[in-house]
Amino acid sequence: MKVVEVKHPLIKHKIGLMREGEISTKRFRELATEVGSLLTYEATSDFETEKVTINGWNGPVEVDQIKGKKVTVVPILRAGLGMMDGVLEHIPSARISVVGIYRDEETLEPVPYFNKLASNIDERIALVVDPMLATGGSMIATLDLLKEKGCKHFKVLVLVAAPEGIEALEKAHPDVELYTAAIDEKLNDKGYIVPGLGDAGDKIFGTK
């Protein structure tokens, strides 16, 4: 599995800001969008382009355009919604597929409860977004679902990943690409990433 920890100074700075314990909901939400945008820039760097001729201000001009990529953004509810706008800043025409999965606080196992996928999912590359890759359970369950529906191409974008989650994801779905702003130390006994960001969903939505 291709794993890319994006070490651009802007990303490192913004993730550092997100680790502040008393960060406001507004600021955390803004930073999640910004880092999601920067990760999208990196994750799409291998998209092929083609030359096309358009009518410019002074006549025909040859320009580069993305070649034949149908994209669907797949936020994992609910926290993934906090990164979605950052992706759409760069790919505003992308279709949105929504997958609802929560993690049982006792077993730490993923529990699917909702999905609404874009049409022709089998023809699209899926950019799956979720702030935290902790145990990997929710991400694995989401990719299982997408594959069942015929999707063949995936890129996973997360703010912070734990080594345990990366290992689990690679074992279950070695064909995906993972882009993360940080690979942290470990999971604690409650399944939270350390040092991590805390509960990203609560911080994005202002809930406890």
From Swiss-Prot:
UniProt note on regulation of activity: Allosterically activated by GTP.
GO biological process, one term: uracil salvage
EC number of the protein: 2.4.2.9
Top EC group: transferase
GO molecular function: GTP binding; magnesium ion binding; uracil phosphoribosyltransferase activity
Positions contributing to uracil binding: 193, 198-200
Binding positions for 5-phospho-alpha-D-ribose 1-diphosphate per the UniProt entry: 78, 103, 130-138, 199
Catalytic activity: UMP + diphosphate = 5-phospho-alpha-D-ribose 1-diphosphate + uracil
Free-text comment on the cofactor: Binds 1 Mg(2+) ion per subunit. The magnesium is bound as Mg-PRPP.
InterPro entries given in the database record: PRibTrfase_dom (IPR000836), PRTase-like (IPR029057), Upp_B (IPR034332), UPRTase/APRTase (IPR050054), Ura_phspho_trans (IPR005765)
Keyword Phosphoprotein set for record: no
Keywords of the record: Allosteric enzyme, Glycosyltransferase, GTP-binding, Magnesium, Nucleotide-binding, Transferase
Known pathway: Pyrimidine metabolism; UMP biosynthesis via salvage pathway; UMP from uracil: step 1/1
Record bears the keyword GTP-binding: yes
Cofactor: Mg(2+)
Role according to the record: Catalyzes the conversion of uracil and 5-phospho-alpha-D-ribose 1-diphosphate (PRPP) to UMP and diphosphate.
NCBIfam families assigned: PRK00129.1, upp
Similarity annotation: Belongs to the UPRTase family.
Record protein name field: Uracil phosphoribosyltransferase
Organism: Aliivibrio fischeri (strain MJ11)
Recorded name of the encoding gene: upp
